[in-house]
């Protein structure tokens, strides 16, 4: 958060945008959408060794309580409408993190008739995390990239 100035009486001046974006980055509540083996690495990121909670993230079971969806694994044609429905139930502002080669572009099953070649064909994706499966460190790096993207956006002031 950029602080523009500190006055004599202990007041801090900054913009409203930077305060709102700081609060958003410190309280991302992801909803897990684990479809395959990448979901296991997502569970590792939530466990004690990597502790995704230190970034202010709290896994939520309901789309109405979350603002980040982590799509982890192979997205089949039959599951695509459910993914879109869950995405539409999330409140604004909402972000999507695509985790793994299968979610990014179909992965190993790219040429299968039943696989969607990337979840970005169904929902808009903000951050792509590569790997098969990506490690928990890669997921944490993707979360940090998303936080930096949120800090760069204008919430109130339009450019």
UniProtKB/Swiss-Prot annotation:
PROSITE patterns attached to this UniProt entry: COMPLEX1_20K
SUPFAM superfamilies tied to this protein: HydA/Nqo6-like
Cofactor(s), by name: [4Fe-4S] cluster
Entry keyword annotation includes Iron: yes
Details of cofactor binding: Binds 1 [4Fe-4S] cluster.
Catalysed reactions listed for this entry: a quinone + NADH + 5 H(+)(in) = a quinol + NAD(+) + 4 H(+)(out)
Function: NDH-1 shuttles electrons from NADH, via FMN and iron-sulfur (Fe-S) centers, to quinones in the respiratory chain. The immediate electron acceptor for the enzyme in this species is believed to be ubiquinone. Couples the redox reaction to proton translocation (for every two electrons transferred, four hydrogen ions are translocated across the cytoplasmic membrane), and thus conserves the redox energy in a proton gradient.
This protein's name: NADH-quinone oxidoreductase subunit B
